[in-house]
A protein has these predicted regions:
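An alpha-helical, amphipathic repeat domain used for nucleic-acid recognition
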Residues: 1-177
């Protein structure tokens, strides 16, 4: 942007020292890191680790760390807020089990203490989620001869426990949904 180049103006044909060159390239890399942060965060929220990994593909470590600190200071990057939003999205929209959500949060680089705090403060009832899933997504599959077995297997692969699945089927059979 124009402010950056106005700040770092050099006359045509002017020779610069190695130190000036290094300082200029450092400023350019920092600006590149900041611009990349804004670009990535404008698309979706990221954890600090996710953003750091993406920045390190194109920017050096020093400027990556500086840019991340700036995003944290501005409030654009907050792992706790990101974790709460992720839990809400994965549990409500994607209908995932608590254990699968925990695994996904680890994968995205959220600190273990933030994961446990977020999952404690958020009430996720796997049985309610399962009842909803079974009645919407799996209802037709239950009509098949081995439907119960296939649905149970599918739900277990999604991270739900056999106990929770059985409880959900019992609630459906008893009309408690």
């Amino acid at each position: 942007d124009i402010d950056f180049w106005a700040e770092n103006y050099f006359k045509d044909g002017q020779e610069i020292t190695e130190e000036q060159w290094q300082e200029l390239t450092d400023k350019i890399n920092y600006k590149k890191a900041i611009d990349k942060c804004y670009d990535l965060l404008s698309r979706r929220d990221h954890s600090v680790k996710e953003l750091r990994t993406k920045l390190l593909r194109t920017v050096d470590e020093k400027n990556t760390d500086r840019a991340i600190e700036k995003m944290i200071d501005y409030g654009y990057l907050d792992d706790e807020k990101y974790a709460r939003n992720l839990v809400k999205y994965l549990s409500e929209s994607r209908k995932m089990s608590k254990s699968f959500i925990k695994q996904e949060m680890y994968k995205r680089g959220i600190a273990p203490d933030i994961i446990s705090d977020t999952l404690e403060e958020t009430e996720i009832d796997n049985t309610d989620t399962l009842v909803d899933l079974i009645l919407t997504k799996y209802r037709n599959k239950l009509k098949a001869e081995d439907g119960y077995k296939k649905v149970t297997s599918s739900l277990m692969r999604k991270g739900f426990s056999y106990y929770d699945i059985k409880s959900a089927f019992n609630r459906i059979e008893n009309g408690e949904y």
